[in-house]
Amino acid sequence: VRLIPPQLADTARLKTLGDEQRKSASRSGAFHDFRFTDRLPESGITYRNRVVSDAAKNYKSAHYDHGTGMAVADVDGDGRLDVYFVSQVGGNALWRNVGGGRFEDITREAGVALSDRVGVTASFADTDNDGDPDLYVTTVRHGNVFYENDGRGRFRDITDASGLGYNGHSSGAVFFDFNRDGRLDLFLTNVGRYTTDTIAGEGYRFYVAFEDAFQGHLKPERSEQSRLYRNEGANRFVDVSAETGLQDLSWSGDASPIDANGDGWPDLYVLNMQGNDEYYENAGGARFVRRSREVFPRTSWGAMGIKVFDVDNDGRMDIFIVDMHSDMSHEVGPDREREKSHMTWSEEVRGDGKASIWGNSVFRNEGGGRFREVSDSINAEMYWPWGL
C-alpha cells in the first residue's frame, strides 16, 4: 500500500508549483550543466537503515527520529572514495568502491560493524598524519568509538588508549587543527540528555526517550556539554574544554570551523537545534571567547546542518545553515509545512525571539569579521531541511 498525500497527487498543483520554482531559479544567476541519475540498483549497495522502536513502531517525539549519518573517504588508498553508513540498529556498514560505480561490502573484513550499539554518525580524519583516514563513530549512550586505519582499509579499535571514548548523547565529530600544531583536534557535539535510564529493545538494546524529550532544553539538568579534545600525537587526545573556555551547552548536532575574523586562527560556529547558535572566537589557539551575539546578532532557531563555503565567489568564506523551522508564510508543500509556518511558540520555548531567525540562514562574509544575513534575498528557504 502506498499512501500519497492528496496535495502531492494533485498534478495541476504540482505543475503550478514547478513553474513557480523554475521562474524563481531563472532569476538566481546560478546555472549548471549536470544532472543526477539514481544508480543505486547498479551500485550493488544493499544497505538499509534501521531505527530503534522509539523512532519507528513505538514512535514518539524524540531525537532518535533525527536518523543517522554517513562518511566518505578512500579507506584503502586505491584512489576511489568508499562509503561508511551508520545505523541505529543492526550495525554499520563499510562499502568499498571497486570502480565503475560498483561497491562491495567489506564491513566484516574492516572490523567496523559496531552491531552492539545505537549509532548516530561518523567522521573520517587522518589524526596520526600517516596518510590514511582514521574513523570516529558517535553513538547514543553506548560509548563513542575511535578506529585507527592500517592503510589497507582494516581498522583497529583504539578507543581506550586514545581518550575519545565519551559516553553520552553524541552527534557530530568535527576535526580541525584549532592550535595549528599540525595535528587534527576533535570538537564533539552533544545533543543533551533525551533518554531515560530504562532499557528496551527486541534483539538489541537502547535507552527509552523521555516523553518530553523536545522540552529538554528547558531543563538545565538535561544539558550535556560538548567537548574539545586536543591531539597530543600518536592518536592520543586530551579533553581541553575547560582549559580553553569552550564549554558549550547547546543541544548541538553539528558545528563547523571558520576563520571568521581573518586572523588565521580557526574559530568555531556551533549549531543549536533547540535554541540560538553560538560562535566562539579562537584566541591564538589557547582559548575560545564566546562572541555569539556581537558577530551574529540573530541566528536560526533549530539549526540542523551547516556548510562553510564561498557563496558569492568574492574570496571570503560564507556560512549556509539549514533550519528545521520554516519562515514561509504561504503554503508551499505538504500540509505539515503550512501548519508549521503558522505555529506560535511560547516565549519560554523560544527564548529571546529577537535573536531568532525562523528558517534557513545565510551569512555573507563582509570582511573584517562582519557578516550579513541574506537568506531571503537569495531564495535560500526550503521545506523542513534536516541536514546539509
Cite the ranges covered by each PLM segment.
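Acidic, glycine/proline-rich Ca2+-coordinating loop motifs
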Residues: V1-L388
